[in-house]
Amino acid sequence: MHCPFCSATDTKVIDSRLVSDGHQVRRRRQCLACSERFTTFESAELVMPKVIKSNGNREPFDEDKLSGGLYRSLEKRPVSADLVELALNTIKSQLRATGEREVPSDMIGNLVMDQLKELDKVAYIRFASVYRSFEDIKEFGEEIAKLEK
């Protein structure tokens, strides 16, 4: 690690601690050349699979798009931001757990629907109506009937 003060390459770690619920390591370092101290944070770089769209195009996974869809479905619903973040992390973990380099967009949509079904039934219906392109009231009724079973 280069010292941010003198650019020397020799530094030593004085202290290491887990932060962010164990997902990050905070290290206190000291430069061996100028004796200045500084803090670094280390976390794993997790690679998300590419998304195969329904038209066959491939694009990088977009976390903002995923969270935007979840938050839009949950707009004005009594669900805490912490629960939404937990749902987002669950979806991302499930995608990484596939071990695939590419996943179809409908898989992501189904994972979102599974999470919304647990979080809020109204948000689930909102998302399903757009995701499945409901054409009329009958389709809403059928989806609601499935939820009530």
UniProtKB/Swiss-Prot annotation:
Its cofactor is Zn(2+). Belongs to the NrdR family. A zinc finger (unnamed) spans 3-34. Residues 49-139 form the ATP-cone domain. GO terms for molecular function: ATP binding; DNA binding; zinc ion binding. HAMAP family: NrdR. It comes from the Bacteria. This is Transcriptional repressor NrdR. InterPro entries: ATP-cone_dom, NrdR-like_N, RNR_NrdR-like. Pfam families: ATP-cone, Zn_ribbon_NrdR. The lineage of its organism: Bacteria, Pseudomonadati, Pseudomonadota, Gammaproteobacteria, Vibrionales. Coiled coil: none annotated. Negatively regulates transcription of bacterial ribonucleotide reductase nrd genes and operons by binding to NrdR-boxes. Keywords: ATP-binding, DNA-binding, Metal-binding, Nucleotide-binding, Repressor, Transcription, Transcription regulation, Zinc, Zinc-finger. It comes from Aliivibrio fischeri (strain ATCC 700601 / ES114) (Vibrio fischeri). Binds 1 zinc ion. One of its GO terms (biological process) is negative regulation of DNA-templated transcription.
